[in-house]
């Protein structure tokens, strides 16, 4: 029998290491449903919090707002995304985005993309690069640290 988690009845996890302004709840919906090829996460974004820093990935990402109204920053500027809004963030710099909740009510949203690993994210505002190879193996580095291809060989 297939697992069928209800997105309106999730228990959210919080990471104590998240700084103020980025404290959001996450529920790993696709994992609960037994998915392997697509990663679907549900986020509870409290008022005044932001889901993650402005970034882009090298794979398509999607956002569906289930409840509330978020402000979404993209290369074209900021726009509101309210209940039922579906947004696609294309792979690469054109898909850069940041999802924030400047309002007074929580925002409930789904985000999904492929589950390919490693996953690479670029953070243009902080000149940072992130590489994820599983949930427990993350590398975050400043992008300006040039290393010669053969250094250390």
Predicted regions and their residues:
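Short, mixed charged/polar active-site loops
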Residues: 37, 51, 78
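A short, N-terminal "cap"/entry segment at the start of jelly-roll beta-barrel domains
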Residues: 1-37, 122-153
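Histidine-centered metal-chelating micro-motifs
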Residues: 50-52, 71, 86-87, 92-98
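Ligand-binding loop in jelly-roll beta-barrel domains
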Residues: 91-119
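Short, conserved beta-strand element in jelly-roll/cupin
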Residues: 42-46, 55-74, 112-116
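Conserved short histidine dyad/triad with adjacent acidic residue
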Residues: 24-26, 41-57, 94
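Short acidic-glycine-tyrosine-enriched beta hairpin
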Residues: 62, 75-92
């Amino acid at each position: 029998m297939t697992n069928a988690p209800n997105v309106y009845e999730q228990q959210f996890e919080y990471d104590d290491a998240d700084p103020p302004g980025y404290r959001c709840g996450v529920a790993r919906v696709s994992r609960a449903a037994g998915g392997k090829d697509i990663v679907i996460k549900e986020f509870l974004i409290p008022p005044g919090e932001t889901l993650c820093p402005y970034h882009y990935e090298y794979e398509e990402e999607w956002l569906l707002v289930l409840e509330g109204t978020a402000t979404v920053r993209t290369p074209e500027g900021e726009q509101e995304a309210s209940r039922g809004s579906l947004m696609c963030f294309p792979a690469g710099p054109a898909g850069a985005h940041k999802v924030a909740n400047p309002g007074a009510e929580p925002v409930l949203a789904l985000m999904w993309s492929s589950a390919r690993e490693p996953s690479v994210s670029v953070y243009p505002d902080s000149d940072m690069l992130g590489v994820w190879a599983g949930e427990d193996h993350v590398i975050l580095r400043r992008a300006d640290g040039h290393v010669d291809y053969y250094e250390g060989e």
